[in-house]
Regions:
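Specific transmembrane alpha-helical segments of multi-pass solute transporters/efflux pumps
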Residues: 18-23, 52-103, 139, 227-245
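Single conserved hydrophobic/aromatic residue that forms the stacking wall/gate
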Residues: 1-5, 9
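Transmembrane alpha-helices of multi-pass small-molecule transport proteins
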Residues: 31-82, 109-110, 167-174, 188-207, ...
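Transmembrane alpha-helical segments that form core, pore/gating elements
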Residues: 24-27, 51, 110-112, 116, ...
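Hydrophobic transmembrane alpha-helices of multi-pass small-molecule transport proteins
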Residues: 51, 113, 122-144, 199, ...
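Hydrophobic/aromatic residues within transmembrane alpha-helices
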Residues: 29, 39, 43, 90, ...
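Juxtamembrane helix-entry segments on the extracytoplasmic side of multipass membrane proteins
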Residues: 6-7, 32-41, 64-70, 142-167, ...
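Helix-helix packing/entry segments at the starts of transmembrane helices
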Residues: 10, 41-42, 80, 84, ...
């Protein structure tokens, strides 16, 4: 059991690491010919094709109830359309630093929604873990002096990034039972199919005027990474965790993204890794550990059948 749990945590870490790399790579791609709406289209269409191909080549042929097909539509709106559109367009307007700061709100919003809709207890460990993780993430983001000095924020972009976090938090909270009923590939192929149908009518003009021949090969490589690694593979890994873990734990791994950004910054010579960065990383991992150790609603019911006292 511990080995299986460890594997799930590793997948969550890998997914968030891919999303951490997506911000600088996606921002660079949008600075060299790929518009924000075009990148959203590539992500939706590319991932839909990948998941359908995986379904056809593998053993993922599942019958989906008509009601669940409708539910997949709404799940796709929250997890893909609102989340990806708002974040990608927001990233094109604001700085990667501001976008990263806004992502730290996801665990907080998810904890509140899980308490309201799933009756998950807001325990001391959970609150302390989220607080430690947020402080660590903010230290990493704001400690990147080069990015902080050269990144210009934009209120509209920041609000779009915040909307993306809120929509994904609602998705994590409301659709957990639906996701548990089907394989990851079945869930994703329908969600991305619906997302593609909704997105393309609004983005096809951007695709039509895209200067395909003038876009450098490096930009296409960055776009391919965003589509295949940060969308297709990352969603597979994230969904595996969503099926087994509580929503707040899944969202806590969002704090891994600033760590990846810090590593990239140091590797490219744009940042340094000192004691403050080391302390920030420890705070992030300590926060994630505290949340994973916090007791769920089921745990508290087992310990106190007559009541649930959120003290740990």
């Amino acid at each position: 059991r511990s080995s299986a749990a460890s594997d799930v945590y590793k997948r969550q870490f890998a997914a968030c690491a891919a999303w951490g790399l997506m911000s600088p790579l996606g921002k660079d791609a949008m600075a060299h010919g790929i518009s924000g709406l075009a990148l959203v289209s590539f992500r939706a269409v590319g991932a839909a094709l990948c998941f359908w191909l995986t379904s056809l080549l593998g053993r993922h042929k599942e019958d989906v109830a008509p009601r669940d097909l409708l539910m997949f539509f709404f799940a796709g709106m929250l997890a893909i359309v609102f989340n990806q559109c708002c974040f990608t367009i927001g990233l094109s307007l604001t700085s990667p630093v501001n976008a990263s700061i806004v992502t730290t709100t996801l665990p907080i919003v998810t904890m509140i929604l899980a308490a309201l809709f799933l009756k998950e207890p807001v325990t001391n460990k959970k609150v302390l873990g989220i607080f430690c993780g947020a402080i660590g993430a903010l230290l990493l983001i704001l400690g990147n002096g080069h990015a902080a000095q050269n990144g210009n924020g934009n209120l509209t972009g920041d609000l779009l990034c915040l909307t993306a976090q809120c929509s994904f938090a609602v998705y994590l909270t409301i659709f957990k039972k639906l996701i548990q009923k089907y394989t990851v590939v079945t869930c994703m192929k329908w969600m991305f199919t619906y997302a593609t149908i909704v997105i393309l009518p609004f983005t096809y003009k951007d695709l039509a005027i895209l200067p395909w021949a003038e876009i450098p090969a490096t930009t296409w490589f960055e776009t391919a990474f965003v589509v295949f690694v940060a969308t297709y593979l990352a969603y597979i890994m994230m969904m595996t965790g969503q099926k087994l873990l509580r929503p707040t734990i899944v969202s806590m791994y969002n704090y891994v993204q600033p760590i990846v950004a810090c590593i990239v910054s140091v590797a490219t010579g744009l940042g340094v890794f000192g004691w403050s960065q080391g302390a920030a990383v420890l705070l992030v991992f300590g926060g994630v550990w505290l949340v994973t150790q916090s007791k769920s609603r089921a745990d508290l019911k087992t310990e106190h059948p007559s009541h649930t006292d959120p003290e740990s």
